[in-house]
C-alpha cells in the first residue's frame, strides 16, 4: 500500500485493518466491517501502525490489540510474536471478546516467590530410597495385561 494514496478498495488495507490518508504520518481506521484488528499504541515509541508492522512488534510498546479469530488463524505466528514481546492480544468472535493471549512471566514469578519466602532454592540432592530392595514381579507385566484384556 502506498502512503498518501486514497483508499478505494479492500486491497488498500494492510493486515491490521488500517488505511493510509493523504498525510503519511496519520492513519485513519477503517469502518468496522473492513477492520481486521483495532490496535492501541503507546505514543512514546511508535507513531503509526505501519511503524509497528515494520518493526515486527519488537521496538513498539503495544498496550492491547483486539483481533478476530479469522485474523488470528491467518497470522498466528505474528500474533504470538506480539505476545512474546510483551503485548496483549484480545481474541474476539463477532466482536465479542472470548480470550486473552499474553506472554508468560515464569521467571518473575519464581523470583517473587523466593523473595517472599514462599519457596526456597534446592539445597541438597533428592534423597534416594534406601533400606529396602525393589520388589520383584512374580510374573511378567505382559501376562497381567493379557489377563485384563480377556
From Swiss-Prot:
Induction: Induced in persister cells in response to D-cycloserine.
A Pfam family of this chain: PhdYeFM_antitox
Composition skew (Basic and acidic residues), residue ranges: 141-150
Region (Disordered): 124-150
GO MF, one annotated term: toxin sequestering activity
Keywords (A to Z) from UniProt: Toxin-antitoxin system
Recorded GO CC terms: plasma membrane
NCBIfam families documented for this protein: phd_fam
Family annotation (PANTHER family): ANTITOXIN VAPB46 (PTHR35377:SF5), ANTITOXIN VAPB49-RELATED-RELATED (PTHR35377)
Family as reported in the entry's similarity comment: Belongs to the phD/YefM antitoxin family.
Functional note: Possibly the antitoxin component of a type II toxin-antitoxin (TA) system. Its cognate toxin is VapC49 (Potential).
Protein name per UniProt: Putative antitoxin VapB49
Amino acid at each position: 500500500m502506498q502512503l498518501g494514496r486514497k483508499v478505494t478498495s479492500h486491497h488498500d488495507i494492510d493486515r491490521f485493518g488500517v488505511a493510509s490518508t493523504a498525510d503519511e504520518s496519520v492513519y485513519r481506521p477503517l469502518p468496522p466491517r473492513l477492520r481486521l484488528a483495532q490496535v492501541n499504541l503507546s505514543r512514546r515509541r511508535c507513531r503509526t501502525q505501519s511503524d509497528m508492522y515494520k518493526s515486527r512488534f519488537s521496538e513498539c510498546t503495544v498496550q492491547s490489540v483486539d483481533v478476530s479469530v479469522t485474523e488470528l488463524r491467518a497470522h498466528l505466528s505474528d500474533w504470538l510474536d506480539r505476545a512474546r514481546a510483551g503485548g496483549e492480544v484480545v481474541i474476539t468472535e463477532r466482536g465479542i471478546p472470548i480470550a486473552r493471549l499474553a506472554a508468560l512471566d515464569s521467571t518473575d514469578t519464581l523470583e517473587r516467590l523466593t523473595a517472599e519466602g514462599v519457596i526456597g532454592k534446592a539445597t541438597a540432592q533428592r534423597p534416594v530410597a534406601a533400606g529396602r530392595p525393589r520388589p520383584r514381579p512374580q510374573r511378567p507385566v505382559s501376562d497381567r495385561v493379557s489377563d485384563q484384556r480377556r
